[in-house]
Amino acid sequence: MAFSRIELRNFRCFEALTIDISSNSNLFYGKNGCGKTSILESIYVASCGRSFRTSNLESLIKNGSNSFKIKAYDDNTGSILEINKTKSKSINIKINNSLVTISELARTFPSFSIDSKTFFYNDNAPDYRRKHLDRGLFIASTEYAKDWFGYFRGLKQRNAALKTGDIHQAKAYDEALINHGTKLNYFRENLVLEVKKIYLDLVKILEQYNGRAQLFSGIDINIKSGFNDELGLKESLIQSESVDLKRKTTILGPHKADIIFESKDLLIKDIFSRGEQKILSILWSLSQNIYLEKFFNISPILLLDDLSSELDSEMLDCFLPIIKYIENRFIFSNIVDSFNSKIDLNEQSFKKFHVEQLT
């Protein structure tokens, strides 16, 4: 499901705001500080109960108010979502007047945020890339979520035993790690394999419009499992026991996985400009979004904040043609609306909002 209308009350800088969202592409533009990012943030909060800007939801409450409220509608299903956050109280989430958890919300109204952290995906720590990978699988597969929780529950218990120096007690949790961890690795490897295919298809489309897009076709993208693939997870755990005991933590396993982006054996983060890294990160996130629709029949909202930052005009032109190939709901922001002559889209499917005129 996806929102067709969203209403905000006392959210960030907005006292009251109602927006009817296109089923395809939506552009919010205006000068810095006008509230563009806050609108995207409100949609993200409405889809997962969290912000992509802060872990403190109380900071989203408008100054002078005691709470914020988000109400969203899905015209296709008739569903109504209500989110309330009052100071010093937990967030309250209802779908069709029934209380739901954050996990249930994320599966009902899935979304992906491409924000300042995602822009420089390759500059971030492996933990960030794992979370980005896991988020999509979490939304799509209850089986994956079950194995994820099972693995990390066993990992926590194993590490607790290692801290006491009891290797025999630690080994008691190896079976849980092996069973759940092997499945996690399978899901992740399959995702990366299929997303790579989609990514390369997108690059081929861009190459038809701009030769500079060839830069993105020669990239090697591989997942590192976090353990010795030739030995397997079971044998890797056995061989690392002495080191685990010495360090008092489990050093190998899917919790150490990473996705590596390279070109000619050099890390992308070391050779790509910031603008090139940003386009790569957007294309990879978009490919993952398409993967979820293709293999799991879910259509996450795709949120992209501040499109043109860090991009020169040539790199921006390199990316823009892909917008008309995005079938899911795409919501993005930019300082100015400079796309009239650059995006050939049906006006009924592409809506523009001048944020300064909305307030």
Regions found by a protein language model. Name each.
Residues A72, E327-I335:
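Structural recognition of the conserved hydrophobic beta-strand(s) that form the central parallel beta-sheet
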Residues S79, F120-Y209, K224:
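An accessory alpha-helical subdomain
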Residues K36:
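Conserved lysine of the Walker
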Residues Y44:
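Helix-to-loop junction immediately C-terminal to a conserved catalytic motif
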Residues M1-K31, H168-I301, E310, E314, ...:
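Conserved NTPase motor "head" modules and their coupling/switch loops across ABC/AAA+ ATPases, GTPases
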Residues S47-Y128, L137-A140, Y144, K196, ...:
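Nucleotide-state sensing region of NTPase/ATPase domains
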Residues D305-L307:
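Walker B catalytic acidic pair
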